[in-house]
A protein has these predicted regions:
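Bacterial N-terminal signal peptides that target proteins for export
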Residues: 1-7
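C-terminal motif of bacterial Sec signal peptides marking the signal peptidase cleavage site
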Residues: 14-17
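Bacterial signal peptide processing site
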Residues: 19-22
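N-terminal Sec/ER secretory leader and immediately downstream segment
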Residues: 24-107
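Alpha-helical transmembrane segments and their juxtamembrane interface "caps"
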Residues: 59, 92, 113, 143, ...
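Mid-length scaffold segments of soluble, non-membrane domains
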Residues: 97-167
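A structured, mid-to-C-terminal "fold-capping" secondary-structure block
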Residues: 171-240
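Non-transmembrane, aqueous-exposed alpha-helical and coiled segments at domain scale
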Residues: 250-251
Length: 251
C-alpha cells in the first residue's frame, strides 16, 4: 500500500526533473548557438533605446545637469576672466551662480526633446551597423549615435535651447538676459581705457550655440556610461535578448 501511494510522487519527481533538465538543455543549446542577425540587431536596438531613455531621464530631471559635476554646464572658457573680476564686485558671485543655474535649467528642459531623434536613428540601423557596434569598442554604440544624429540634434536642438534661455525664470529674468548683463558689464570694462591698458578682451559668444554643444556633450557622455554598463555588467542586461547578445562578449 505504501508503495502504491509513493508511485504518484515518484512520477511527479521524475517528470519535474525531466522538465528541468529539458529546460537546462535548451538554455545550454541556445547559449551555444551562434547569434542570428535578427538577435544582434534586435539586441543592439534594445540596448540603445535603454541607454537613450535612461540618459534622457537622468539629465531631464531637476538638477540633472546642475548637480552633476561631469556634465554641469559652466560659462565658456572665454568668460573665465569675467568670472574672476565680476566676483570682486559686491553680489558678483551670486550673479554668476544665478546664470549657471539658469543655463543648466535650460539644458534640463531641452534634453527631453532629444530622444525621438535617437529613436529614429536606432530604427534605421542596419545589420552591418549592428555587427560593427557589437564587435567594436566600449563606446561603439555611442559613436554610432553621435555620427548619425549629431547634426540633426544641433539643428533641432539649438532653437529649443534658444527658447529655453529666453524663458523668464526667477525674478522674471531669462538666462539670455543674465548672460547679456554679465558680458555687457565686462565688455564695458574691456573697452575702457583701463581695460585696454590691462589687455582685457571683449567676449562675443553665441550663448545658445555654446549651450547646445555642451548640453549634447553631456547627453552623449551619459549614453556612453549606459553602454559601458550594459557591456560589462550582466545585471544591467534587463531582458533575455540583452543577456544573450551581450553575454556573447563575456567569453
Amino acid at each position: 500500500m505504501k508503495t502504491n501511494r509513493l508511485l504518484p510522487l515518484l512520477f511527479i519527481f521524475i517528470f519535474t526533473s525531466c522538465a528541468e533538465l529539458m529546460q537546462l538543455a535548451e538554455q545550454t543549446a541556445s547559449s551555444d548557438r551562434p547569434l542570428s542577425s535578427t538577435e544582434i540587431i534586435g539586441g543592439l536596438k534594445e540596448a540603445l533605446v535603454v541607454g537613450v531613455t535612461n540618459s534622457s531621464s537622468i539629465l531631464g530631471a531637476t538638477d540633472g545637469y546642475y548637480k552633476d559635476d561631469l556634465v554641469k554646464i559652466l560659462l565658456p572658457p572665454e568668460a573665465d576672466v569675467i568670472v574672476k573680476n565680476i566676483g570682486k564686485i559686491p553680489g558678483g558671485n551670486q550673479l554668476i551662480e544665478d546664470v549657471l543655474l539658469k543655463i543648466n535649467r535650460a539644458a534640463e528642459d531641452a534634453v527631453k526633446d532629444a530622444k525621438p531623434i535617437f529613436v529614429n536613428s536606432i530604427k534605421n540601423m542596419t545589420i552591418t551597423d549592428a555587427v560593427g557596434i557589437l564587435k567594436g569598442g566600449e563606446n561603439a554604440a555611442t559613436n554610432y549615435l553621435h555620427k548619425t544624429t549629431y547634426d540633426q540634434l544641433v539643428e533641432l536642438y539649438r532653437p529649443k535651447i534658444k527658447a529655453s534661455v529666453e524663458k523668464k525664470l526667477v525674478g522674471n529674468v531669462s538666462t539670455a538676459q543674465s548672460w547679456n548683463t554679465i558680458t555687457k558689464k565686462w565688455n564695458d570694462i574691456a573697452k575702457s581705457l583701463v581695460g585696454q591698458m590691462a589687455g582685457f578682451k571683449t567676449v562675443d559668444i553665441e550663448l545658445d550655440e555654446y549651450l547646445t554643444h555642451k548640453a549634447l556633450d553631456g547627453l552623449f557622455l551619459k549614453i556612453a556610461d549606459e553602454e559601458k554598463l550594459i557591456r560589462k555588467d550582466p545585471l544591467a542586461r534587463a531582458s533575455s535578448l540583452l543577456k544573450r547578445v551581450f553575454g556573447s562578449l563575456d567569453t
